[in-house]
Amino acid sequence: MSWLTEYVRPKIRGLLKREVPDNLWTNCESCSQMILVKDLQKAMNVCPHCGHHMRASVAERFGWTFDEGTFTRIELPKVPVDPLSFRDRKRYTERLKDERSKSQLDESMAVAHGRIGGHDAVVAVMAFEFIAGTMGAALGEAFLAAARLAILQKAPLVVFTASGGARMQEGMVSLMQMPRTTVAVQMLRDAGLPYIVVLTNPTTGGVTASFAMLGDVQISEPNALIGFAGQRVIEDTVREKLPEGFQRAEYLLDHGMIDMVVKRPALPEMLGRLIGLMNHRHVNAPGAALGGAAPVRPAA
């Protein structure tokens, strides 16, 4: 008996443990159902049980959005690393180093150019995994670089937003990126080029108050949180209870703040159609590009 308990059973347990890797399954953030990781990846990180759209990495966004094998990421301008010599629980320079090591990204925005539905396009993707996608000087430079590249290539600019707002470690330098990115959007308009924004969960703060809400066409993924201040802050300020679903994509669609809510698997085709229409018609207004169509909801 001791031979069985001390030798055979531990060996069996060890074999069983090795057969089931820790990263084989994951749980949905919304419904808590278990999902096979490879099935979740095939579904573009959309829960097959409840349809919840989980966060996506920069690499995944580029891979899903561009036609296969057509995109190239660009090197972005360098900026001063720590203009204020800021320190909270740790030095800002140390925080950046840790975030870069953890996320394998240089900053909270990446830019690439390629083809979407056969059309040339420039795409900028915000990385929420990098200090909550906060906006600092590097993001401002990245956005300007994306706009300039779009103008150079005479191509539309598509931006995927995901942000907690301005980066407090950069103070006023961070807030200055709001007018800078707004100027970049105006540069695109002056050049007659389409600017399409895809709002993802969450898009808040200074990003919402600047380039995230200036698109010629405003698209959102289902149930994305979109707003400036948080719901509790607003309720404390106005002394009123806010409506159910306030600041969610569907509420904003009903109240005319965005043009359409599109499920993630349908996004590449929708972007290709929009770019084709807007390039062909040489228009900036979403109503003209869509023939005056009504707001679009995701298919059931």
From Swiss-Prot:
Mapped zinc finger ranges (C4-type): 28-50
UniProt superkingdom: Bacteria
A molecular function GO annotation: zinc ion binding
EC number(s) on file: 2.1.3.15
Cofactor: Zn(2+)
Catalysis: reaction(s): N(6)-carboxybiotinyl-L-lysyl-[protein] + acetyl-CoA = N(6)-biotinyl-L-lysyl-[protein] + malonyl-CoA
Domain CoA carboxyltransferase N-terminal: 24-293
Gene this protein is translated from: accD
Record: residues binding Zn(2+): 28, 31, 47, 50
Any one of the GO BP annotations: malonyl-CoA biosynthetic process
Cellular-component GO terms for this entry: acetate CoA-transferase complex
Gene3D superfamilies for the chain: 2-enoyl-CoA Hydratase, Chain A, domain 1 (3.90.226.10)
Pathway in which this enzyme or protein is active: Lipid metabolism; malonyl-CoA biosynthesis; malonyl-CoA from acetyl-CoA: step 1/1
UniProt similarity note: Belongs to the AccD/PCCB family.
Quaternary structure (record): Acetyl-CoA carboxylase is a heterohexamer composed of biotin carboxyl carrier protein (AccB), biotin carboxylase (AccC) and two subunits each of ACCase subunit alpha (AccA) and ACCase subunit beta (AccD).
Keywords noted in UniProt: ATP-binding, Cytoplasm, Fatty acid biosynthesis, Fatty acid metabolism, Lipid biosynthesis, Lipid metabolism, Metal-binding, Nucleotide-binding, Transferase, Zinc, Zinc-finger
Function of the molecule: Component of the acetyl coenzyme A carboxylase (ACC) complex. Biotin carboxylase (BC) catalyzes the carboxylation of biotin on its carrier protein (BCCP) and then the CO(2) group is transferred by the transcarboxylase to acetyl-CoA to form malonyl-CoA.
InterPro entries named in the record: AcCoA_carboxyl_beta, Acetyl_CoA_COase_Trfase_b_su, ClpP/crotonase-like_dom_sf, COA_CT_N, Znf-ACC
Keyword Oxidoreductase in record: no
Coiled-coil regions, chain positions: none
Free-text remark on how the cofactor is bound: Binds 1 zinc ion per subunit.
Primary localization: cytoplasm
Locations listed in the record: Cytoplasm
Protein name: Acetyl-coenzyme A carboxylase carboxyl transferase subunit beta
Enzyme class: transferase
